[in-house]
């Protein structure tokens, strides 16, 4: 049984009883309850009898201001900025990469300790905008073109050219990286 969740949505409510609401660590906490004494966060998910969580994007996405965590901007993360970096707004310290990495790994390990598999939702069909590291590395190579214009079949613009050998290699290596490291 697979349950789709968002790191932010799963514990952000003030009644969730977690120490780190809306964060990787919030989902790693055990023994959390709401005011009514009902299980929340990880314990709630475990009580559902699920076998896997499919976590909405947790790679670095663009439209959340990581410098203003109290601002509570909302986004599910389908605006990729860097495919191989954990999202900073879900960490307790977005300015230090090692914190993002450690806390995301702690969350995933907590799921595994409970016998829950983790499926990572990664959107490799587009990037947030054309001011991406891919575009800066090799202009127009990593993006699908329709003549002289950028293709927009994904309805997001900035459509990734997965048919390009190096883009395909990048995607495969990225998936392998996440599976191996997390």
Predicted segments — roles?
Residues 1:
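Basic K/R-rich, polyanion-interacting modules in nucleoproteins and related proteins
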Residues 5:
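Active-site ligand-binding patch in enzyme domains
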Residues 8-182:
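Substrate-binding/active-site clefts of carbohydrate-active enzymes
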């Amino acid at each position: 049984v697979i349950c789709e969740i968002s790191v932010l949505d799963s514990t952000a409510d003030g009644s969730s009883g977690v120490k780190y609401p809306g964060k990787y660590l919030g989902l790693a906490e055990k023994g959390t309850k709401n005011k009514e004494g009902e299980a929340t966060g990880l314990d709630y998910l475990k009580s559902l009898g699920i076998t896997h969580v499919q976590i909405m994007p947790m790679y670095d996405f663009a439209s959340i201001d990581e410098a203003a965590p109290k601002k509570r901007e909302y986004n599910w993360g389908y605006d990729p900025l860097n495919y191989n970096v954990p999202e900073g707004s879900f960490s307790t310290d977005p300015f230090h990469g090692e914190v993002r990495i450690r806390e995301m790994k702690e969350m995933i390990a907590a799921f595994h300790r409970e016998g829950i598999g983790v499926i990572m939702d990664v959107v490799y069909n587009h990037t947030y905008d054309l001011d991406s590291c891919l575009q800066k590395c090799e202009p127009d190579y990593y993006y699908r073109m329709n003549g002289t214009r950028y293709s927009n079949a994904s309805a997001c613009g900035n459509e990734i050219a997965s048919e390009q050998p190096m883009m395909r290699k990048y995607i495969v290596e990225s998936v392998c990286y996440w599976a191996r490291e997390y």
